[in-house]
Regions:
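Short Fe-S-cluster ligation motifs
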Residues: 1-4, 204-213, 248-253
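Short, small/polar residue-rich loop motifs at catalytic or cofactor-binding pockets
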Residues: 159-161
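Short cysteine/histidine-rich metal-coordination sites, predominantly Zn2+-binding motifs
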Residues: 236-248
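Radical SAM/AdoMet-radical enzyme domain recognition
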Residues: 1-3, 7-120, 125-130
Length: 253
């Protein structure tokens, strides 16, 4: 899981990175973007390079709602970019799936059904509605509301330490995709491998802390309420791994 703060496609030489990954990674490639830079030319370049999944965050049905959530964003343009992508995938008969996602929040909660209906009918393979999270506690207003709602709820382990690692453009490996300010970074990728980092004492200690509900050594996790929005396989509602295993099952067996 490679990420940057902002749109992934804005990374310099992004096309070259994707082409290299397609040739050498021997795994499935998922590109997450807001659709702003997703021209037909770029879409075809990525599809030809072997991108398997596009996960596009749009967050609104109405243009005026989008402008409130994504200031200076142009939903009309970005929506058309996604519709063009659907057309390119179909006409080129590419083996690629499209996920359109939506973070439900006060500005858009009255148009969730419209959003789901539109994109299901438009040809998206999955339409995902996510809960608004606190960016691992960084968004204090969201964090405070979540903590109030969770005050009588028994805490469960967060799924993320068992689900993924994140790799930043700066070469840091972290354990939390919700954390945007770097507190989950624990090692430089140049000093390890994904396998070694995943099986490291640090990650095993982190998992044990979540299982024991004892965060003495992991204050970043202790203060974060976003565990409540992660879904384990036996819970109601699909999690990210469930969706990806359906989209690209051969990669997860």
């Amino acid at each position: 899981y490679y990420y940057r703060r902002g749109c992934l496609m804005a990374i310099p030489k992004f096309d070259e990175i994707i082409e290299y990954a397609g040739k050498h990674a021997n795994t499935k490639i998922n590109v997450t973007t807001n659709g702003a830079l997703l021209t037909e030319k770029k879409a075809k370049t990525m599809l030809d390079a072997g991108v398997n999944v596009f996960d596009i965050s749009l967050d609104a049905y109405h243009d005026e709602t989008y402008e409130k959530i994504r200031v200076k964003g142009d939903l009309k343009k970005y929506r058309q970019n996604v519709l063009n992508l659907i057309d390119v995938i179909k006409k080129g008969k590419y083996n690629a799936k499209l996920v359109v996602s939506y973070v439900e929040q006060p500005f858009n909660s009255n148009e969730t059904d419209l959003f789901e209906k539109f994109w299901n009918e438009a040809g998206a393979d999955f339409v995902v509605v996510r809960k608004l999270h606190s960016a691992a506690g960084a968004k204090s207003n969201v964090k405070n509301k979540m903590e109030l709602a969770l005050k009588d709820v028994v805490r469960k382990p967060c799924l993320y330490p068992w689900e993924r690692l994140v790799l930043t453009p700066e070469g840091d490996l972290g354990f939390c995709p919700a954390g945007w300010t770097g507190e989950s970074h624990f090692i430089k990728f140049k000093d390890t491998t994904i396998k070694k980092a995943w099986q490291s004492n640090f990650m095993n200690d982190l998992r044990k802390a979540h299982l024991d509900n004892n965060y003495d050594c992991f204050g970043f996790c202790e203060q974060c309420p976003d565990w409540a929005h992660t879904k384990w396989p036996d819970e109601h509602g699909a999690n990210y791994s469930d969706m990806m295993s359906e989209i690209v099952p051969s990669d997860l067996q």
